[in-house]
């Protein structure tokens, strides 16, 4: 692990608590944190532990977009976060959300990638170069000129990263970026993050999946009930005993040794049958002639690359 003690602080939390309207308790409370320039920080913990709220305080969405009461002080690049207008934070902190389509403003790839730069007044003669550079960064030449909505989750994630990269912020915040990605897309995401880290960007990732971040992370912060309970280096994270890992509910660092207890089905009564199911979206074929049967007690996994129709099939069945 690199020694970051001598580097400048880019994000600081001083005894920070935040409460959403109507909540009985703070979403996070008494958080103190110092993130250094170029550091790769991973926030992990169970759902509702405060990871997302912490990222919203870094990118300015908490208070300025999501109403709530902030106590303590959050400092971004030497200034109180409260002193920044939201548009100025966006130049310094780029955000990639769990569901990329929630942050899209355009329907065509190049238009979306250029959108942030256009709003920040980037000169037209510079704009094309920034867009091309961002597309190259994600290996996205095959995505040029395409509609975004029919894309797979992995492709949308790439466009989200490219749109942020075109603005060229110093800090990147990812909120559960792998949640909707298959293994190949996760590997592509890891490669993108690795390149950003190599360039010296500060990266904060709130995530449940941890296996792909072990080689990248400088620190892991484990959160529970709105507080930071434990801090680990990457090596310390790997050394956590299996019993403790299961007890605190964090994901495995090695996917090759996962034990799952699946009880055998007690009945064999057919509860569902699908015959020759075909579906297209706006003339884009999604899948065709799918047939299968499901029986009471069955546990069926629908697997495949992003974009092959897993979610569409699930939506039809539901």
Identify the role of each PLM range.
Residues 67-79:
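Conserved ABC transporter NBD signature motif
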Residues 125-143:
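Conserved ABC ATPase "signature" region
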Residues 147-151, 155:
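Conserved ABC ATPase signature
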Residues 161-162:
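Hydrophobic anchor residue at the start of the ABC signature
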Residues 172-175:
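Catalytic Walker B motif of ABC-type/P-loop ATPase nucleotide-binding domains
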